[in-house]
A protein has these predicted regions:
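Donor nucleotide-sugar binding loop of glycosyltransferases
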Residues: 26-29, 57, 85, 111
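N-proximal low-complexity "stem/linker" segments adjacent to membrane-targeting elements
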Residues: 1-39, 46
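Acidic donor-diphosphate engagement hotspot in glycosyltransferases and nucleotidyltransferases
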Residues: 33, 61, 89, 113-115, ...
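Hydrophobic helical membrane-anchoring modules
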Residues: 1-16, 156, 187-268
C-alpha cells in the first residue's frame, strides 16, 4: 500500500523536523540520498527542513546541493572549512529550527524512514533518541564480520571509560529535541568552536562526547534498534579512524578530570 504523496510544506512557521546531513566530497552519493529524503518527506504531513553542512568539499558537493535548493526552498547548505564530521554536525544542529532535529550520515546507511521510530520516543517524553545497530530488532546488512567485531571492542571501551549503558554510540542517526541539541552542541569541547582544520576524511568519536554530556545533564536518552546497511564505499578506515575515536574517548575522560565539563549537571 502506497502513501499518497503530498507537497512538502515550506511554510515560514517552525519546521516540525530538521534533517542535518554532514557532507564531505559526497557528489556521488548525495543526489540519491537527497532524493530519498525528499520522497520520504512527501509522505509526511508536517513542515520540514533539510540542512546539508558541507565540510570543505573539493568536489561538486556544493553544486549538487545548490541544484536541489533551486527546486526546494526548504533545502539549504552551510559551507564550512574542512574541520571534520563532528564540527559539521555541530554547525547544522545549532542552525536547525525544527522542533526535532535529526542528524543522518550522507549515505543514508540507516534509511530515513527509521526516523519515525525515533520520533515516537521523543513524543513519549524522551529528550534524545539514538539509532542503534545492536539490540532486539536491529538489522546490520552486509557488514563484514571483522568490522562488527571492531565495533564491539570499541563499544566495550566506551562503556568502561566514558558512557555506560549503550550498546551502540556510533550509529550516525540521532534525533534530539531542539532545545536539547542547542544545549549539548554548544557545550562540546572536542570538535566545538575552536576545532582546527582537518586532513582528508575525518571520522571521530564526537558522538561519545555528546552522549557523555547528555547523561551529565540528566537528559533522557533512548537507544532504538534500527536497520543499517554497510556500504562497500564507506569512508571509515577500520584502523586509523578506530585509533582516532579511541583517542577521542580518552580526551572526553581527560576533559572531565580537568573540570572542562564542570557545571554541566546544573540544568535548573
Amino acid at each position: 500500500m502506497h502513501r499518497r504523496q503530498r507537497k512538502i510544506k515550506t511554510d515560514t512557521v517552525q519546521p516540525f523536523l530538521s534533517i542535518v546531513i554532514p557532507a564531505y566530497n559526497e557528489e556521488r552519493r548525495l543526489p540519491g540520498s537527497l532524493e530519498k529524503v525528499l520522497s520520504f518527506l512527501q509522505t509526511r504531513d508536517y513542515p520540514a527542513e533539510v540542512i546539508v553542512v558541507d565540510d570543505g568539499s573539493t568536489d561538486n558537493t556544493v553544486g549538487i546541493v545548490e541544484g536541489f535548493m533551486a527546486r526546494y526552498p526548504f533545502v539549504s547548505i552551510i559551507k564550512n572549512d574542512h574541520r571534520g564530521k563532528g564540527y559539521a554536525v555541530r554547525t547544522g544542529m545549532l542552525a536547525a529550527r525544527g522542533t526535532y532535529v535529526l542528524f543522518s550520515d550522507a549515505d543514508l546507511a540507516t534509511p530515513i524512514g527509521e526516523v519515525d521510530r525515533l520520533l515516537a520516543f521523543l513524543g513519549d517524553g524522551y529528550d534524545i533518541a539514538i539509532g542503534s545497530r545492536e539490540g532486539l530488532g536491529a538489522q546490520r546488512i552486509n557488514e563484514p564480520g571483522y568490522r562488527h567485531l571492531m565495533g564491539r571492542v570499541f563499544n566495550l571501551l566506551v562503556r568502561l571509560m566514558a558512557v555506560g549503558g549503550f550498546q551502540d554510540t556510533q550509529c550516525g542517526f540521532k534525533c534530539f529535541r531542539r532545545e536539547v541539541a542547542q544545549d549539548l552542541f554548544q557545550r562540546v569541547q572536542l570538535y566545538g568552536a575552536e576545532a582546527g582544520l582537518a586532513k582528508g576524511g575525518m571520522v571521530t568519536g564526537f558522538d561519545v562526547e555528546v552522549l557523555f554530556l547528555a547523561l551529565k545533564r540528566g537528559y533522557k536518552v533512548k537507544e532504538v534498534p534500527v536497520q543499517w546497511h554497510y556500504g562497500a564505499n564507506t569512508k571509515v578506515s577500520p584502523f586509523l579512524d578506530s585509533a582516532r575515536m579511541f583517542m577521542d574517548v580518552l580526551r572526553v575522560r581527560l576533559n572531565d578530570w580537568r573540570g572542562k565539563y564542570k557545571g554541566t549537571g546544573d540544568r535548573g
